Amino acid sequence: MLKIETGRIIKSLSGFYDVRTENKVITCRARGHMRRGGMSPLVGDIVDISVEKGKGMVERIHPRKNSFVRPAVANLELLVIFAANVNPVTEPFLIDRVCAIAGDQEVPVCICVNKCDMDPGTDLAAIYRQAGYTVIQTSAETGMGIDELRNALRGKFCAFTGNSGVGKSSILNALSPELKLPVGEVSEKLGRGRHTTRHVELYDVDDALIADTPGFSSFDTDQMEVILKENLQYAFPEFGRYLGQCQFRDCSHRKEPGCAVTTALAAGEIGKTRYDSYLKLYEKAMQINEWELK
């Protein structure tokens, strides 16, 4: 009879999964029925594995608290979204889409405005503080914000995500210098970073567990989850205090008269770039039927 052990997937690469059990790390493959059933293991999954002749096999994936397509992780307790106001400048819509996906799954978000030694990103930080997010301004070069970020991560299973070249790996190195992760350069011609992180892998940093994930660009947004239009309003925390105050119960917060959200927008209580992102995501959601997401 095979011995079954339980552990967490800490690395996924080319169909192989490194699973950390109580006292060791075992490289495993997944049973074919998982792949055929459309539920492939993700970094962060709690799994049961069997080991025979030194080879591991993922037998079962425990129920997930949450899961993401991009970054490809499960069971997050905090998602840290990296952004910068210098080359490569982060598009607000990219931040907002990832924020909304996390909000839809009730995963807390921290916005890390990085490279503040080059540009403090004050306006960018203000947008997300106004929206109700935790915002930390950091610099791997000067150490700005590193201790504050360390405290925010403490005791949590987290993922670092953001566009390529925004400095996720540099901040991980600043948090834990012994990691010595490779750091890429930003292409001056293309204005975007080169990928240095090519797979998702977990790292122990103090008492936090951090997933470093590959960077993405605006071309990757179509691979991300789509939120049902009925749920989208709840994924924007700054809308919360106005929900239920609109003239119409089924208000979409777009063109309807008596909308409390658009009234707040006109009064400057909701940021315009955030609201514009809501409209773009709503348009995408209108093209999706609920049955397509199951």
Name each model-derived stretch.
Residues 17-21, 28, 49:
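SH3/SH3-like beta-barrel fold
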Residues 2-3, 15, 38-55, 61-79, ...:
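Helix-rich effector regions associated with P-loop NTPase G domains
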Residues 86-132:
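Phosphate-binding glycine-rich loops and their immediate beta-loop-alpha structural context
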Residues 25-41:
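Beta-strand/loop nucleic-acid-binding surfaces
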Residues 115-166:
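Canonical P-loop GTPase G-domain recognition
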Residues 168-184:
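A conserved segment at the C-terminal end of the G1
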